[in-house]
Amino acid sequence: MLISGSLAAIIHLFLSRQQEHDGFTQQEWMISIEQMMNECKESQAVKTAEHGSVLICTNLSGQDIRFDIYHSMIRKRVDGKGHVPILDHITAMKADIENGVVLLKIESEDQKVYQTAFPVYSYLGGG
C-alpha cells in the first residue's frame, strides 16, 4: 500500500508538471536530493570528480554510482552504464565534500540556485 501510494504521488508529480516552467518544483528537488543522499548513505566511499561536477558513491558491492550532468539534467549511472534521469532543467551542478558532509549546489534553467548538505556516513563510521 505504501509503495503504490508513493508511486501514485510520483506519477502525479510528473503528469501535473507545467511544461512552460523552465525550472523544477520543490518536490522534484526534494525527491532528487533524497535519492542522492540514500546512495551516499549506503556507500563505502564518496568522492567528487571533474572539479565537482560529478558525485561518485562506491557502494558495498564495489559499484560506482555516478551522478553527473548530461544535457540539462542530472543523471545516475552505475559503473558507467545506464542512464536514469534524476533532476531535469538544470544548468550547473557543483559538489564538494567537507568534514564528512556533501555540499551540493545546483542552478536551474530559470537561474535559481539550490543548495543542500547531507552527511556522508562512511566518513562518520557508518554505512
UniProtKB/Swiss-Prot annotation:
The keyword Transmembrane helix does not apply. GO terms for cellular component: pilus; plasma membrane. It is found in: Cell membrane; Fimbrium. InterPro entries: Competence_ComGF (IPR016977). Keywords: Cell membrane, Competence, Fimbrium, Membrane. Its main location: membrane. It is a peripheral membrane protein. GO terms for biological process: establishment of competence for transformation. The keyword DNA-binding does not apply. Disulfide bonds: none annotated. Pfam families: ComGF. NCBIfam families: pilin_ComGF. The transformation pili are flexible filaments, consisting mainly of the major pilin ComGC and smaller amounts of the minor pilins, including at least ComGD, ComGF and ComGG. Interacts with ComGD. Interacts with ComGG. Required for formation of the type IV-like pilus (T4P) that plays a role in transformation. Involved in transformation. Transformation pili are dynamically extended and retracted, perhaps thereby promoting DNA uptake and transformation. Required for transformation and DNA binding. This is Competence protein ComGF. It comes from Bacillus subtilis (strain 168). The gene is comGF.
